[in-house]
């Protein structure tokens, strides 16, 4: 995550209540991000309870509950039980239905910080997904504090990474000249080793809340978020490609076809 985005994400984690969502396809690192956030929040003074399916990692000092649909313990049922234990932070492995979402909203309204995941292509699309589930727009506006969308790309190995001058058609197609002052503009190729995250962070603000109240579409929400400083997954990827972290091909592989 870029430095401004990381600072904004940590600011959202520092809030005493609200819903913070992490979204992306399967295998995009959502659970890892949530566990990292929980580790940061995990102090002796803070009571944290998770509801997961499955529990992927054991976190010391955190009460983690595995849902068991076969015996009637689903996400909604587990959440109803843990809210009575008055936790400070609740992590829901995934918001899958309206009932689970309503409990998350109510938990936020009663002073809990709620972390969870969705499967959407972008941060803005998560808002319309919640609306499609049947959550009232005013409840989303008053409880969702931020949404982090992410993708994983393969990282170029510095030992084999080679720079080359970006062709004019690629510069024009992707607007690379607006993203760097470097001349000539360089891109990179080589072998891959490890992975890097592309991120976009939507922070709820008054303009977005106003758009929510009139049921604006995801594109309008994203445009408003960009005016407030949101950097899209695609733009974050282009910047990483220009920095030699990954290749342009990798960025396009994971962001092409995204629509809001």
Regions found by a protein language model. Give the residues of each.
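Short, flexible helix-loop junctions that flank or precede catalytic/ligand sites
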Residues: 1-260
């Amino acid at each position: 995550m870029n430095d401004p985005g990381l600072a904004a994400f940590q600011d959202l984690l520092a809030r005493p209540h609200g819903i913070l969502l992490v979204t992306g396809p399967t295998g995009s690192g959502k659970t890892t991000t949530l566990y990292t956030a929980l580790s940061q929040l995990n102090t002796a003074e803070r009571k944290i309870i998770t509801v997961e399916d499955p529990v992927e990692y054991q976190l010391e000092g955190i009460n983690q509950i595995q849902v068991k649909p076969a015996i009637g313990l689903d996400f909604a049922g587990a959440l109803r039980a843990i809210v009575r234990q008055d936790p400070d932070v609740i992590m829901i492995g995934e918001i899958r239905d309206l009932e689970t979402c309503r409990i998350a909203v109510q938990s936020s309204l009663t002073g809990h910080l709620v972390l969870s995941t969705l499967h959407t292509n972008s941060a803005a699309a998560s808002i319309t997904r919640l609306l499609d589930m049947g959550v009232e727009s005013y409840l989303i506006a008053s409880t969702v504090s931020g949404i982090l969308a992410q993708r994983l790309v393969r990282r170029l190995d510095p030992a084999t990474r080679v720079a080359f001058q970006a062709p004019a058609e690629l510069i024009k197609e992707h607007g690379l000249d607006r993203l760097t002052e470097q001349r000539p503009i360089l891109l990179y190729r080589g072998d891959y080793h490890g992975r890097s995250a592309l991120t976009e962070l939507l922070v709820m603000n008054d303009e977005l809340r106003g758009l929510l109240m009139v049921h604006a579409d995801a594109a309008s929400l994203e445009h408003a978020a960009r005016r407030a400083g949101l950097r899209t997954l695609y733009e974050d990827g282009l910047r990483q490609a220009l920095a030699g972290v990954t290749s342009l091909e990798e960025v396009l592989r994971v962001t092409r076809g995204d629509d809001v």
